[in-house]
Amino acid sequence: AASDVYKRQAVTFPFRKNESEGTIKYFSLAYPIIDALDNGKRLIIDEFDSKMHPLLTCRIITLFNSKETNPKNAQLIFTTHDTNLLSANIFRRDQIWFTQKDRYGATELYSLAEYKVRNDASFEKDYLSGKYGAIPIVGDLTRLFNTQEK
């Protein structure tokens, strides 16, 4: 009978096994994001951009920056290495903060608002060129591959 052909059976779908780490992270952040927005809370996330698509991180940031979706002024505080987020289209200058280690290893925290920045400046380009500091000291990595003895 036709009904036998289309008989449905429950299928177990192990979410953590079958989904990407980015999808799992997104779903694990969904409730804290909704809770923060609904109740005007602070949400603090380390390595926010890790494992997630850049468009998704921008969408989440937009939720917090919008008066419509964030009428209770919830705050999203996060660390990131995604320089694409350094944009006047996403953040005001006072919303962007940098960290830099001093010579003793203590971390200094400072805002982009402390710098005189032209209205048409590219925050990302200026940051990557070292204009705002907070750039890691990489050094000459080619020495790691020099296997010849002198």
Residue ranges of each PLM-predicted region?
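GG-anchored amphipathic helix commonly corresponding to the ABC/SMC/Rad50 NBD signature/C-loop
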Residues: E19-L43, R59
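Conserved D-loop-proximal element of ABC-family nucleotide-binding domains
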Residues: H53-P54
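Conserved P-loop NTPase mechanochemical-coupling segment
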Residues: K7-N18
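Short, conserved, surface-exposed binding loops centered on an aromatic residue
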Residues: N18, I34-L37, E68-N70, A88
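Walker B catalytic acidic pair
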Residues: D46-F48
